[in-house]
A protein has these predicted regions:
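Active-site loop/oxyanion-hole signature of alpha/beta-hydrolase fold enzymes
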Residues: 52-94, 260
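Catalytic histidine-centered segment of alpha/beta-hydrolase-like enzymes
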Residues: 246-255, 259
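Conserved alpha/beta-hydrolase "acid-adjacent" motif
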Residues: 221-227
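Gly/Ala-rich beta-loop-alpha elbow adjacent to hydrolase catalytic centers
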Residues: 95, 99, 103
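Short beta-strand/loop motif that positions the catalytic acidic residue
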Residues: 208, 214-216, 220
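Conserved HGGG/HGGXW glycine-rich cap/lid loop of the alpha/beta-hydrolase fold
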Residues: 8-63
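Flexible "cap/lid" loop of the alpha/beta hydrolase fold
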Residues: 104, 108, 114-148
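Conserved alpha/beta-hydrolase catalytic His-Asp/Glu region
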Residues: 128, 133-134, 148-206
Length: 274
């Protein structure tokens, strides 16, 4: 489906009915990243959730526009999108990497509309960002399998700081959920887009008191984890989970723990709304 926002055509998919959950992917991937890790979770729960997956401008099936220069504008686009498909409705938001920054931007601007927050390896900007932990390490590597890949595929898969487990299982999900989007992203557009807000998304007027889950990878070289921990007091209902043997693709490398922690978070959100 397509939603007209300003002069943009935002590609999106809706799965299921019930409480709306807005899924925001990170920088360069598309909706398939969130769909790939979240749909298996929702298949294991009995409650009803309306899952909304969409492509940010310049990524996936949503074309960017020259006037989009910064993340403030990107946030405005998301809010307009929400107003169009969920007019006046409260919702839950889940964001990965850059999408985690955008999700916190939504809470900063409209905290009363959000009933729960999931942050998956989110981008954080604060005083510890320059030394944010996350020392990349490869724990499992199947050299026989890797040598069977094309040089191009192997270079994507082994890129510094991304996949700390390099085997066929992780590769299969990486090629299903992430790699295709990386190959079609508009890098010219992204190169002219500021990945920061002009404001501090975490400078909330009051703490966010809804069920929150913060997931971080101990070996996440891309965004680390210390900056996220610094936010814990601003989200008093947050569970903070730091997983070993997990880089920036935590949801794939530690898929079992990811599923269980997200299920527990969904249960908290559901009971809070009853």
């Amino acid at each position: 489906m397509v939603c007209d926002v300003k002069d943009l055509k935002i590609y999106y998919e809706i799965h299921g009915e019930g409480t709306p959950v807005l899924m925001i992917h990170g920088w360069s991937p598309d909706h398939r990243l969130m769909k790939g890790c979240m749909e298996p979770v929702f298949q294991t729960v009995n409650s009803s959730w309306k899952r909304i997956y969409f492509d940010l401008p310049g990524m996936g099936k949503t074309t960017g526009a020259p006037w989009i220069k910064n993340s403030d504008q990107m946030l405005d686009i998301i809010l307009d999108f929400v107003d169009a498909i969920l007019p006046g409705q409260p919702f839950v938001v889940a964001g990965e990497s850059y999408g985690g920054l955008l999700a916190r931007g939504i809470i900063n601007k409209r905290p009363e509309t959000v009933n729960g927050l999931l942050l998956l390896c989110p981008v954080v900007e604060n005083e510890v960002t320059q030394d944010n932990g996350g020392k990349f390490q490869v724990f499992e590597k199947d050299d026989i399998f890797l040598n069977g890949l094309s040089e191009d595929d192997r270079n994507y898969f082994k890129a510094e700081g991304i996949n700390s487990i390099q085997n066929q299982r992780v590769w299969q999900r990486y090629t299903d959920e992430i790699l295709p989007a990386l190959r079609i992203a508009d890098y010219s557009f992204l190169g002219n887009l500021s990945g920061r807000f002009s404001f501090n998304a975490d400078a909330l007027e009051k703490p966010f008191m809804k069920p929150t889950l913060m997931l971080a990878g101990r070996q996440d070289f891309i965004v680390g984890y210390r900056g996220l921990w610094q936010l814990i007091d601003r989200y008093p209902r947050a569970s903070f989970v730091l997983l070993d043997k997990a880089g920036h693709n935590l949801q794939i490398e530690q898929d079992i723990l990811f599923t269980e922690t997200v299920k527990e978070w969904l249960h908290r959100v559901e009971t809070e709304m009853v």
